[in-house]
Amino acid sequence: MPLRGVIIAVVAAALTVPSAPAAAEGHVETFVAFDPAAGEFPEGIAVDKRGNVYVSLIPANQICRIAPSGAQSVVAEFDAPGLGPAGLAVNAKGTIYVAVSSLNLATRETDPATRGVYRVLEDGTSERLPGTGAMLFPNDVTLDKRGNVYATDTSRGAVWRISPRGSAEVWADHPLLKGSGAFGFGFPIGANGIALRHNTIIVANTERGLLVALPIEPDGSAGAPTVLAESPALVGTDGIALDVHGNIYAGIGVQNKIIRIDGDGSIVILATAEDGLNQPSTVAFGTGRSERKTLFVANFSLLSPAPTPAVLKLPVGEPGQPKP
């Protein structure tokens, strides 16, 4: 997910990224606004089956639940040093899974004592899943129907799988998941946003502008990866979400864009800074009857000289894929 140093390092490069076709799918509106003075910058976002929106807030290091009415409540807090909770997902039972990086921006190191993937129960208690402290940079998560959690390890350039039994292992480690180091952050920024489509894991490689597909084999192992899309217009891609047709939606904070990548690899711009985007990090589809065709956007804005941290709503004309 977007990082302070990453954004600084790639702003200049982002300004030279070729434009993609624009599409006026809907009007961007603010769902809820946060307080930058309180460290409330939304990084990750997820929506449960009841239509509640969950966001990770850094450096406040909280997870906030937003009811369909807009009412907010803190459901979890983390003692992680530096930047804590990042990408998150919610299962059908309302259990939250979140990647906690514990990134110290001064040293550019993560804290092995607190980093990992955490499970947050409805009562607000949380526990680190066994073995995930070995991850170098936990960043985003997705879930399958079997209860497996898949998590990106950004600096290592890998995907981990945590089984329902709690065992964590490196599931996929491939050059296509590795960052190039081009952002100059001190370590590569590779595998980042992650989503599941049927029996395929889709991963965004931030520095290299790639979307990579990893099939889940019948025995549960990772199959050979393939490139779904590759373009300078994808450099900086962060969190991703899919609609019912398999089109991929992504937040690109360094470009102030929300884009859609169609099945043929074509890229369409859905919203820009002119629509109120301010370093958007990631996106998630609504689940309520009136919100299934709405994309909820984490308007991160951590580095903006005029920060406007918020959750935005963007109608996109297609419903999100059903949750596992």
Task: Report each predicted region and the residues it spans.
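Beta-propeller fold detector
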Residues: 29-33, 73-79, 127-131, 169-176, ...
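Short, solvent-exposed loop/turn segments at conserved positions within beta-propeller repeat blades
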Residues: 58-59, 105-114, 154-155, 206-208, ...
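A short loop-to-beta-strand structural motif that recurs across blades of beta-propeller domains
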Residues: 62-64, 115-118, 158-161, 210-212, ...
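Hydrophobic alpha-helical segments and helix pairs
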Residues: 116-172
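Beta-rich, blade/repeat-based domains predominating
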Residues: 35-50, 58, 79-104, 128, ...
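Short loop/turn segments that connect beta-strands within beta-propeller blades
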Residues: 66-71, 120-125, 163-167, 215-220, ...
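A short helix->beta-strand "capping" segment at the edge of beta-propeller domains
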Residues: 23-39
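Blade-level signature of beta-propeller repeat domains, shared across WD40, Kelch, NHL, RCC1
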Residues: 284-324
